[in-house]
Amino acid sequence: QKSDLHHLYPTDSRANSVRGNYNFAEVNGSSVPGNCEASRIGQDRRTTSRSNRFEPPTEHRGNVARALFYFSVRYQIAISESEETYLREWHLQDPVDARERERNNIIYNVQLNRNPFIDYPELPAKIQDF
């Protein structure tokens, strides 16, 4: 799991440290200081939960969604209902692009498997619950 390149991304170390193990959501909160001020940490906009969540930059949200869909299916790890709602939205709002397809091809050449959510963007709609 830890070495699977389909869910590992280079990132700003400060943003990664702040993110920790927080679930993803759109938040009411503050920007992450440092090189990734488009990321935010705070409370989920749609719930009354006081737990912190992490909001990635808009241009990376679809990539995050597809990586987590892959991880959930590949390693049989459930995604919470509230997080899944955001991920499904982000997958549609930030569709697969050429750079993400190329990354999928490169990873295939290294570890001999693909992220099917990149190859088949319609796949999340066919899965009821991650």
How does the language model describe each region?
Residues 1-130:
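Domain-level detector of nuclease and nuclease-like folds
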